[in-house]
Regions:
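Active-site neighborhood of phospho(di)ester-bond hydrolases with catalytic His/Asp-centered motifs
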Residues: 1-5, 25-28, 85-88, 145-149
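Catalytic core of the metallo-beta-lactamase
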Residues: 40-105
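Short acidic active-site motifs
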Residues: 12, 216-221
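Terminal amphipathic helices with adjacent charged low-complexity linkers/tails
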Residues: 144-175
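Structural motif
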Residues: 59, 83-86, 144, 177, ...
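Short, charged N-terminal beta->alpha structural module
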Residues: 181-202
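Active-site metal-binding motif and surrounding structural segment of the metallo-beta-lactamase
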Residues: 1-25
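FMN-binding flavodoxin-like domain, especially the glycine-rich phosphate-binding loop
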Residues: 97, 101, 107-146, 150-152, ...
Length: 340
């Protein structure tokens, strides 16, 4: 049974067919098309449809198509007699399994951040299809989740936590914390980042993560952005554009349709400011609540710029500690379109 055609899952299919020529390969229509496309295998295939069932003696296999979680052919296979679901990449996690495979053999909390990192990097773009898949599976009684990445979840509390985490992530819900991601060439933009962070901490934000995009892995930055509701991005002007690492991060967030965030942005320049324009355009394209005017430093730190940075930290802290919901900022062009 092929739940997912990505080569990290199907790389052994050709070998299996060579060793067992009469083997039957079970998949849905898109799977069988890809099987032929990737490996030239078209014989001995068994086509199944959404909600279909296949008897294998004492047990049955039930198939649930979950397209775009995170490829178009993805599906899950459920064994009702055992109440076990083979979920493909869904509910997956990064991280090695060092000895134990079952959640009873490991420390489950070790994999929570790795599950968020996996979701944000691999599945993060597909929040709506994940929600559709969760609704489709909501009526199943599940004793074990067997993902293709990470531990096998068998403890009822762990199963509930895993499903709840995917539900929250796919709704872009997040914890009350702050991510500050920035690029800096000479230290000026970094100084602004540190001022904002210290002021947010003074005003009650206890979960603050700072990422220098030149030093942090983007994989880790994406994890934290999906984890926390507050996001502030800073960049110097670089050849009339954003700092390359910041530009890459902004592109990655836009590609994942991130929403439901309190957002601020800041930057620095020497003679021509384009940071505000580029980050402002990014903010306008996302469903963020922009908390203050951008903080922009020309050449060096002045007292008024420092105070604006502190104000950004204070306002973000108030948003995160007050329990307020995100209200997406309406821009003039959007307001005109809404009236139409």
């Amino acid at each position: 049974v092929i739940n997912h055609m990505e080569p990290d899952h199907t790389g052994a299919v050709e070998w299996l067919v060579s060793q067992y020529p009469s083997i039957k390969i079970v998949g849905n229509k898109r799977t069988i098309e890809m099987l032929n496309g990737f490996y030239g295998i078209a014989d001995n295939v068994v086509l199944v449809e959404d909600g279909g069932e296949l008897s294998i003696g004492k047990n049955r296999l039930q198939f649930f198509l979950t397209p775009m979680v995170h490829w178009p052919e993805t599906m899950m296979t459920y064994i009702p007699e055992k109440k076990v679901i083979f979920s493909g990449d869904a509910f997956g996690a990064f991280g090695t399994l060092d000895g134990g495979v079952l959640d009873t053999q490991i420390l489950p909390e070790r994999y929570r951040d790795e599950m968020i990192r996996y979701y944000s990097n691999i599945v993060g773009k597909f929040g709506s299809p994940v929600q559709t898949a969760l609704k489709k599976l909501s009526g199943l009684e599940i004793n074990a989740i067997c993902s293709t990445h990470g531990p096998v979840w068998t403890v009822p509390e762990n199963i509930a936590d895993v499903v709840n985490l995917y539900d929250r992530l796919s709704r872009y819900d997040a914890d009350s914390g702050l991510v500050i991601a920035y690029g800096s060439m000479y230290g000026n933009t970094e100084e602004l980042a540190e001022i904002i962070a210290s002021e947010a901490a003074r005003n009650g934000v206890k979960s603050i993560v700072m990422h220098n995009v030149s030093k942090s892995s983007q994989s880790d930055i994406l994890r934290d952005v999906f984890k926390y509701k507050g996001l502030i991005i800073g960049s110097p002007t670089y050849n009339s554009k954003l700092y390359p690492g910041v530009e890459s991060l902004v592109s990655a967030l836009d590609n994942r349709f991130l929403k439901n965030r309190f957002f601020g942005y800041f930057g620095s320049f020497s003679w021509s400011d384009t940071t505000a324009r580029h980050l402002g355009a990014f903010a306008e394209g996302m469903q963020f609540e922009v908390i203050t005017e951008p903080v922009i430093m020309k050449q060096g730190m002045l007292s008024d710029v420092e105070e604006k940075a502190r104000e950004m930290g204070r306002v973000m802290a108030h948003k995160l500690t007050s329990g307020a919901g995100v209200v997406p900022t309406i821009y003039p062009t959007q307001a005109i379109n809404n009236k139409k």
